[in-house]
C-alpha cells in the first residue's frame, strides 16, 4: 500500500515543482538591436543616427525590429514624444505601419503632422489587413485615423486630418434591414455592433461636430435623439449610447454658453433648419428652441442665456416685475384676473385696440387663462353642494343653473383641445401627458352630459332612489361627473410649473407616477397569482344559507375567497389591514386546507408588504432624488414648455370666450369655404419677381448672419475647451515620463557637444604638436649643413625682405641703399588646411605694428626696430639670445620665426638700452646660425601710428607690386604677405 502514497525524499527534489517554459516564444533581439532600441528609448540622437547609418552600410541590425512589448523604434519615439527621433527615423524610411494611429492615441500633434507629410517609399511592402488585425495591429480594422482622433477629441489632430480630405462612414438607421446590415450582423454580430458604436462615438465628438458641421446645434440635436433611440435597441451597449447622447446635449449647451449678446442669441433661437429662399417665414418664432424642446434637449433649453431671453419675452409689459414686492404682484394678478372678461370682450370687438393687444401678451394671456380655470373650479364646487334639494328622487332631473354655467366651459375646453390637436398634430398632442388627462376629463364631461340628456328624455317620473336600477343613467352620470371633478382639480397641478417652489415638486410627483405604474405591473401579477390559488382552494366552501350580507364589507366578513373578483378585493384590502384572519377558516374539519390557505394568505402579505411595498418606496425615493439633483434643469425645461404654449399665435381668448366666433375667425371661415367648397375656386394671384427676390434676400441674409454667429461661437468654444483642458490636466504620471525623456535627451545632447568640443581640442593640439615637431626636425636637418638642403638659397637681404618687406622698403628709402633683391623661391608643397591661429600667423607671416595711444607729438619719438648692416661685427660677438615682449594689450608671445627651407633660429631681441639712430630706429638683434656659425641679425619692427599707416603704404609700391594685406585691430595693425 505504501506505493500508492507519495513519499518525499532527497532523490526526488523536484517532484513538488512545476516546470515553467515560454510557450509563445518570440524572436530574440541581437545586442546591437537592443542597444539601438535602448538609444531610442533614452533619446540618444547621435547613437540612433549612427546605428541607422551603419545599418544602411553593414546591415548589422534590422531598423524595424520589435521589442518584447511589440514596439518598433518609431513607436517608442512616438510614445516618448521625441519629434527629432521621429523625423530621423522617417528620413531613413523605417516601416510606418500603425504609427499614425499610435500618434493619434498618444495625442502627439507634431508626430501626426510628420507622419501625414511623410511619403512612403514606393517599394515598401504592405501588410495584408487580415494579418494586421490578428497579429500586428492593436486596432481593429474599422478604426481609421479620423475615428480615433474623434475618440480622443483632439481638435488640432482632427483639423489636420480633415484638411487631408478624410471621411467617416455614414451609419445606417437604427432599425435598418438592408442587405449590408443584415449580412454584417449575421456574419459577425459583435463586430457589427462594435463598428456601429465606434462610428457613433466618433460622430459624437464635440471637436468633430464643431469643425465639420455647418449647423452644429442641429447635428447635436439629431445625433442625441438618434443615440437615445439606439440605446433602446442595442441593450448590450445601452450605457455607452446614453453617455454619448448626454455628451451631445452637453456640447449644444456649452456652445450656447459662448453667446455674448441678445442679438446673437435671437439669431440662433429664431433660425430654421428647413429654410427655403422663396417661402415667407417668420423671423421671431423661436423655431430652434421649439426644435430643442421636441428633441428633449433639457440642458440647451435650461441654459441661462436662453432662459433670460424667454423671461424678457414673458414679462414683456412688466420689465421690472421680478423686482416688485410679492404683495404688489398678487394684487396685480388678482386685478387682471377679475378683468379677464372685459379684456376678452375688447379683443372680440377690436383685436387691434390697446386692450386687445394687451391680452395677447404671454404673461397676461396666462393670467387670464388661469383666472378662467379657477372660475370653472369654483362652479364645480358650487355644483357639488346641491343647494336645491327638492328633486332628489327625480329619475331624469333637468340641469341646474350651475350646470348650465359649467356647460360653456366644457365646450370651450373641448374646442381648445381640438384646435391644439389641429395645429400641433396628433403625435405632438399625445406626447404630452397633460393633454391625455384633458382628453379623459373632457370625455367624462361629455359622457355625463349625454347620460343626463338621456335620463331627462327617458325618465321623467318621481321614484325613490333606493328602487332605481344599478345602471340607471342618472346614477352613472353622477359617478362620471364625480370622477371628472377629481381630474379637473388635479389638472390645476400643471400650473405649479410656473412657480419656482412648487415646480420641482410637481415634476417629482410626475416621475413618481411612472414608478407607481411599474410597481403596479409587478403587484398585479403577484395579486393575480395568489387570487387564483386561494379561489381554487376555497371555491368549494362558499356559504349561501342564512346570510343577510355576503362579502368582506359585511360586519362579519365571509366568503372572502369564494369568487375570483371577491378574492382580488380581499387581497387588495389586506394590504391596509382590513381583512381578518378568520376568513381562511371553513366549517368542515379540514385543518390541512385551513393551514394551506392561511400559509398562502400569510405569504402573500409578506411579499406584498415587506418586499413589494418597500421596493415601491425605494423606487419613489430614487426618482425624487434624481429630480432633486437636476431640479433646476427639469423645472426650467417644464416651465419653458408652458411658456412656449402661450408664445404661440392663437388661443388668445380663455374659455368660455374662445367658443364665440370673432370677426377674424368668421373671415377665415368664409375664405376657407369660398376656396374649398364653392364651385368657382379662387385662383391664387402669382407673386411678382420683386416680392420673391426681396423674400429670398431676407432669408439669405438670415442664413449668412447665422453662419457668422456660428463661426464666432465655434472659435470661442474651441478656445475655451483648450483652455479648460490645460487647466484640468494637472500633473500626471505621463508628465513625469515626458520630463524624464526630455532630461535624458538633453543629457545626450550635452554629452555630444562636450565630446565634439574635446575632439576638436585634441585635434588642434595634435596639429600644433605636429607643426612644432616638423619645425624641430627642420632645424636639425638644417644644422647638418647646406649640403643636404640645397633646394632654397637665401641671402641676408632676401631674409630681410621676406621678414619685413615693408620695413625694408622704408629703411632703404631713408638710407638710400639697396636692401636686397627680390625673393625667388619654389612653391612649398600643399599641406592640410588647418585652423587659423592668430599668434602663429603673426610669428610666421605677419608684421606686428604697435599702435601708439600717445598724441601725435610723442609718436615721432617711438622706437623703430630694423635690420642693421653690421653683421660681421655681430658675428664675432658670439651668440646672443634675447627675447622681445610684444606689448599689445597684454599679449606676450615668443617670436619663433620658422621659414620653410631656412635652417635657422631667429630670436627677436628688444634692446632696452634705447639705442636710437638719427632716423629714430632702435637696434635689435637676431641670432641666426648659418653653417654652425651664429650670425646676429639686427631686426627692425616699425612702430607707426595707425593714422599714418595709410599714408606710408605708397612707399612700398616701388619695392613690390604685390601689396601686403593689412588688418587693423584695436591697438595694433597686422600686415600679412
Curated annotation (Swiss-Prot):
* Binding locations of Ca(2+): 417, 420, 435, 438
Q: Which stretches of sequence are listed as region Disordered? A: 762-790
Question: Please, what other remarks does the record include?
Answer: The interaction with spectrin is important in controlling the translocation of TRPC4 channels to the plasma membrane following EGF stimulation.
Intramembrane feature ranges: 325-359
Reactions it catalyzes:
Ca(2+)(in) = Ca(2+)(out)
In the record's own words, the domains note is: The protein 4.1-binding domain (654-685) is required for binding to EPB41L2 and channel activation. The calmodulin- and inositol 1,4,5-trisphosphate receptor-binding (CIRB) domain (695-724) is sufficient for the interaction with SESTD1.
> For Zn(2+), which residues are the binding ones?
172, 176, 178, 181
| Its membrane topology | Multi-pass membrane protein
Biological classification of the source: Eukaryota, Metazoa, Chordata, Craniata, Vertebrata
Keyword Membrane listed? The answer is: yes
Query: Which PROSITE patterns does this entry report, sorted A to Z?
Result: ANK_REP_REGION (PS50297), ANK_REPEAT (PS50088)
Protein name (Swiss-Prot/TrEMBL): Short transient receptor potential channel 4
Phosphotyrosine found at: 959, 972
Q: Which InterPro entries match?
A: Ankyrin_rpt (IPR002110), Ankyrin_rpt-contain_sf (IPR036770), Ion_trans_dom (IPR005821), TRP_dom (IPR013555), TRPC4_channel (IPR005460), TRPC_channel (IPR002153)
Q: In which tissues is it expressed?
A: Strongly expressed in placenta. Expressed at lower levels in heart, pancreas, kidney and brain. Expressed in endothelial cells. Isoform alpha was found to be the predominant isoform. Isoform beta was not found in pancreas and brain.
Q: Where in the cell is it found?
A: Cell membrane
This protein's species is Homo sapiens
Basic and acidic residues bias spans: 777-788
Kindly report every residue range on the membrane side named Cytoplasmic. 1-324, 360-362, 419-432, 499-511, 621-977
Q: What is its main location?
A: membrane
Spell out the SUPFAM superfamilies in the cross-references: Ankyrin repeat
Record topological domains on the Extracellular side: 384-403, 454-475, 535-599
> How is it regulated at the activity level?
May be operated by a phosphatidylinositol second messenger system activated by receptor tyrosine kinases or G-protein coupled receptors. May be activated by intracellular calcium store depletion. Inhibited by xanthine-based inhibitor Pico145.
Region (PDZ-binding domain), start-end ranges: 975-977
Which family is this sequence assigned to?
Answer: Belongs to the transient receptor (TC 1.A.4) family. STrpC subfamily. TRPC4 sub-subfamily.
Q: Which PANTHER family match?
A: SHORT TRANSIENT RECEPTOR POTENTIAL CHANNEL 4 (PTHR10117:SF25), TRANSIENT RECEPTOR POTENTIAL CHANNEL (PTHR10117)
